[in-house]
Amino acid sequence: MNTANDIDRLYNAIEINEKTFQFFQIDLQSYGIQEVNKGSTQFFYILLEIMNGKFNCNLVFIVNCYDELGKIIYSNERTVYVDTYIGYDTLKFWCNDTNLIDRTNKIRVFVRKG
């Protein structure tokens, strides 16, 4: 079930570590939350739209979810391969765990060398 309150709360919880994107000269064009589901296993998607970039290695984009105490309760990553990246991509992260929507207080997104 999609609830506007959960979508808004999760979207507002996203923090982008801009320094890591700037290091690789990647422009984050847009991001969002999609398909919030509070079934038996709660899940949602985080979407990132990226452009440009100057790098000569594979990059790993990481999404970490934190609880109200600041503990990491979930992590997911996607790799962008230097050989296939043409200057634009949309990355989709599936975040799923028991009560993950209710437990997530902050979401941090960053990029590192792969």
Q: What do the PLM-derived regions correspond to, one by one?
A:
Residues 63-67:
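Conserved aromatic beta-strand anchor motif in extracellular beta-sandwich/beta-rich domains
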Residues 42-44, 59:
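Hydrophobic core residues within well-ordered beta-strands of beta-rich domains
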Residues 51-56, 68-72:
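Short, cysteine-centered beta-strand-loop-beta hairpins and adjacent loop/turn segments enriched
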Residues 56-62, 74-77:
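Short, hydrophobic/aromatic beta-strand segments
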Residues 69-114:
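Short, solvent-exposed, Trp/other aromatic-anchored flexible loops in extracytoplasmic proteins
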Residues 1-42:
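Transition segment at domain starts
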Residues 45-51:
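Short edge beta-strand/loop segments characteristic of extracellular beta-sandwich folds
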